[in-house]
Amino acid sequence: FKDGVLVRKKSGNRGLGLQIDDLYMITPYWCRKAELLKDPKWLDRAIEESLDYFDYLWDRDDKLMHCLWLEENKAPYGLYWGRGNGWYIMAVTDLLTFIPQDHPKRNEVLEDYRTFINGIIRRQGKRGLWHQILDRPDVYPEASCSGMFTYCILKGVNEGWLDSSFHEAGTKGWRGLLTLVNDEGEIT
């Protein structure tokens, strides 16, 4: 796109698109590249990408991330995919561990992180799990997105990005995940 955000060509002649899980595919790479090469431009690129994804995909009304933004629509598109939202917040959580405290964009990334966490907690089910389609409680609870959200919430509490009141949602998620593990240690 003109603003430099990373996109991919979508199948079926749908043009270019921004897909939520792509952020996790590139952000950790750029963060580690910045660290290994001692070149902050790669960290800055990861930060800008994260901020752009939030701007393109965040639904301010539903407080969730759309899974796709298609150039032809000029708007977010698709479901509130649980796993995709999980990959998004995993990328942002990982990114926050690399951004120095004095970086001029740190607070902006932290604000997006907190906004997302506040939105996702609203969708947590009674058992502590999240559904594969986040705004559809009739769709099955999904282990991988529940694990990602639980990790990111508890990491935020431990790092001081979230206050201790978020610990309850994190432990509720953990208890929910434990109900999915059978006696052989397999996730069911």
Model-derived segments and their meaning:
Residues 25-39, 87-105, 148-162:
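Well-ordered alpha-helical scaffold segments within catalytic/enzyme domains
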Residues 79, 83, 100, 104-111, ...:
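A short glycine-/small-residue-rich loop at the edge of a beta-strand within enzyme catalytic domains
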Residues 1-7, 40-66, 110-128, 169-186:
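Long, well-ordered core segments of solenoidal/helical folds
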Residues 89-135:
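Oxyanion-binding "anion nests"
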Residues 1, 17, 136, 141, ...:
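CBM-like carbohydrate-recognition segments
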Residues 30, 50, 75-76:
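Active-site mouth of glycoside hydrolases
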Residues 5-21, 63-84, 127-148, 186-188:
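Carbohydrate-binding/catalytic loop surfaces
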